[in-house]
Amino acid sequence: MREIIHISTGQCGNQIGAAFWETICGEHGLDFNGTYHGHDDIQKERLNVYFNEASSGKWVPRSINVDLEPGTIDAVRNSAIGNLFRPDNYIFGQSSAGNVWAKGHYTEGAELVDSVMDVIRREAEGCDSLQGFQITHSLGGGTGSGMGTLLISKIREEFPDRMMATFSVLPSPKTSDTVVEPYNATLSVHQLVEHSDETFCIDNEALYDICQRTLKLNQPSYGDLNNLVSSVMSGVTTSLRYPGQLNSDLRKLAVNLVPFPRLHFFMVGYAPLTAIGSQSFRSLTVPELTQQMFDAKNMMAAADPRNGRYLTVAAFFRGKVSVKEVEDEMHKVQSKNSDYFVEWIPNNVQTAVCSVAPQGLDMAATFIANSTSIQELFKRVGDQFSAMFKRKAFLHWYTSEGMDELEFSEAESNMNDLVSEYQQYQEATVEDDEEVDENGDFGAPQNQDEPITENFE
């Protein structure tokens, strides 16, 4: 079976990870001790992807929980879901990264990374055919960003041909915890561009907006935000956990969504999102879900897709839905909004249907878009980074851990390059194919794609 190993790093990563496991246990008919109580064979058919069956018949998540301080891990261990995980897979230090990326990446994290790699190796050896890893972390703190990216590069060295997916929570000015978030996030993106295969960008600001505007929660807690994230993670991984044709593993998902290797940062959306009091006043239909799914207010990243163009889109519908109706609706969206889709990637909207709906819903839809508007998010972090870096503010926290200023400049220019690459492909047209601007950069995919585009006109 094509197994996936899940790694939670840092406080945010562990809390999102715990919410994710709670959600998928419910969907697969497992209780929090790992005992199967399901009533439908489809729930059990691909359980092996995320769970390992122990000799007692208990299903154990292929999950590793890592942090540089014991607090969050203790909270997970003592929660309702704590007995589910293998006790040896909790790995924590006694210090803390203190929200400094350099501590997570070069000093404190580097001391712990070997024991994490040992556990990862052991988990990988317990797989028949490992397809890859998924990591949940935040980019604003110290452990999730610094140690998370260190782990990603170590895993890359050791498993170069396996897929690497990350669920990364980006910092946002409205919900800022620490002043150095822009540094941590930029240094992390610098690593993710090189080492990750697919990164699902989640943004605290967008999550707060959804909770307040759409779900009508006045004071959303982190628990509410994590439930939103776990719904999306459950939706994104639907095609990996249930039998189906499209995007049935991480590699196929990447092939369908990533046109150029560096541009692998996705926006995610989810439908239905309704306030608890309004649910009985709405009917869930495929057109309704499709409309809500493409709505900018449902995006979990604070970027507006209307300001850019979609390179590729994948949509997952769950529940008793007609495949034909889904195809028709998606086709309708594309033809009505053709300006928002780049024309040099034909058939760039993929849809998959899974008959198992999320718990408590008749149907739901998850949306993954590779949109050029994600550059807004990187621009925002980049501007904050530049404002601090040109004054060398708080830099001593990083240089005292052995970092060089040069690494900051490299990270800054890598992120600026990423923004301009997204911009370049947003403006590209089919005619640009062979035109080269003064810098010698190609404006769009080159000649080998030309016949394909022509065939579809």
Swiss-Prot record:
<dbReference type="GO" id="GO:0090307">
    <property type="term" value="P:mitotic spindle assembly"/>
</dbReference>
<feature type="binding site">
    <location>
        <position position="204"/>
    </location>
    <ligand>
        <name>GTP</name>
    </ligand>
</feature>
<dbReference type="Pfam" id="PF00091">
    <property type="entry name" value="Tubulin"/>
</dbReference>
<keyword id="KW-0460">Magnesium</keyword>
<comment type="function">
    <text>Tubulin is the major constituent of microtubules, a cylinder consisting of laterally associated linear protofilaments composed of alpha- and beta-tubulin heterodimers. Microtubules grow by the addition of GTP-tubulin dimers to the microtubule end, where a stabilizing cap forms. Below the cap, tubulin dimers are in GDP-bound state, owing to GTPase activity of alpha-tubulin.</text>
</comment>
<dbReference type="GO" id="GO:0007017">
    <property type="term" value="P:microtubule-based process"/>
</dbReference>
<comment type="subunit">
    <text>Dimer of alpha and beta chains. A typical microtubule is a hollow water-filled tube with an outer diameter of 25 nm and an inner diameter of 15 nM. Alpha-beta heterodimers associate head-to-tail to form protofilaments running lengthwise along the microtubule wall with the beta-tubulin subunit facing the microtubule plus end conferring a structural polarity. Microtubules usually have 13 protofilaments but different protofilament numbers can be found in some organisms and specialized cells.</text>
</comment>
<feature type="binding site">
    <location>
        <position position="69"/>
    </location>
    <ligand>
        <name>Mg(2+)</name>
    </ligand>
</feature>
<dbReference type="GO" id="GO:0003924">
    <property type="term" value="F:GTPase activity"/>
</dbReference>
<keyword id="KW-0597">Phosphoprotein</keyword>
<feature type="binding site">
    <location>
        <position position="226"/>
    </location>
    <ligand>
        <name>GTP</name>
    </ligand>
</feature>
<feature type="binding site">
    <location>
        <position position="138"/>
    </location>
    <ligand>
        <name>GTP</name>
    </ligand>
</feature>
<dbReference type="GO" id="GO:0007010">
    <property type="term" value="P:cytoskeleton organization"/>
</dbReference>
<dbReference type="InterPro" id="IPR008280">
    <property type="entry name" value="Tub_FtsZ_C"/>
</dbReference>
<protein>
    <recommendedName>
        <fullName>Tubulin beta chain</fullName>
    </recommendedName>
</protein>
<keyword id="KW-0342">GTP-binding</keyword>
<dbReference type="InterPro" id="IPR023123">
    <property type="entry name" value="Tubulin_C"/>
</dbReference>
<dbReference type="GO" id="GO:0005200">
    <property type="term" value="F:structural constituent of cytoskeleton"/>
</dbReference>
<keyword id="KW-0963">Cytoplasm</keyword>
<comment type="similarity">
    <text>Belongs to the tubulin family.</text>
</comment>
<dbReference type="GO" id="GO:0005874">
    <property type="term" value="C:microtubule"/>
</dbReference>
<keyword id="KW-0206">Cytoskeleton</keyword>
<dbReference type="GO" id="GO:0031122">
    <property type="term" value="P:cytoplasmic microtubule organization"/>
</dbReference>
<dbReference type="GO" id="GO:0005737">
    <property type="term" value="C:cytoplasm"/>
</dbReference>
<dbReference type="GO" id="GO:0000022">
    <property type="term" value="P:mitotic spindle elongation"/>
</dbReference>
<keyword id="KW-0547">Nucleotide-binding</keyword>
<keyword id="KW-0479">Metal-binding</keyword>
<feature type="binding site">
    <location>
        <position position="144"/>
    </location>
    <ligand>
        <name>GTP</name>
    </ligand>
</feature>
<dbReference type="GO" id="GO:0090316">
    <property type="term" value="P:positive regulation of intracellular protein transport"/>
</dbReference>
<dbReference type="InterPro" id="IPR037103">
    <property type="entry name" value="Tubulin/FtsZ-like_C"/>
</dbReference>
<keyword id="KW-0493">Microtubule</keyword>
<feature type="binding site">
    <location>
        <position position="11"/>
    </location>
    <ligand>
        <name>GTP</name>
    </ligand>
</feature>
<feature type="binding site">
    <location>
        <position position="142"/>
    </location>
    <ligand>
        <name>GTP</name>
    </ligand>
</feature>
<dbReference type="InterPro" id="IPR003008">
    <property type="entry name" value="Tubulin_FtsZ_GTPase"/>
</dbReference>
<dbReference type="InterPro" id="IPR002453">
    <property type="entry name" value="Beta_tubulin"/>
</dbReference>
<dbReference type="InterPro" id="IPR013838">
    <property type="entry name" value="Beta-tubulin_BS"/>
</dbReference>
<dbReference type="InterPro" id="IPR017975">
    <property type="entry name" value="Tubulin_CS"/>
</dbReference>
<feature type="modified residue" description="Phosphoserine">
    <location>
        <position position="278"/>
    </location>
</feature>
<keyword id="KW-0046">Antibiotic resistance</keyword>
<dbReference type="GO" id="GO:0000226">
    <property type="term" value="P:microtubule cytoskeleton organization"/>
</dbReference>
<dbReference type="GO" id="GO:0046677">
    <property type="term" value="P:response to antibiotic"/>
</dbReference>
<feature type="modified residue" description="Phosphoserine">
    <location>
        <position position="280"/>
    </location>
</feature>
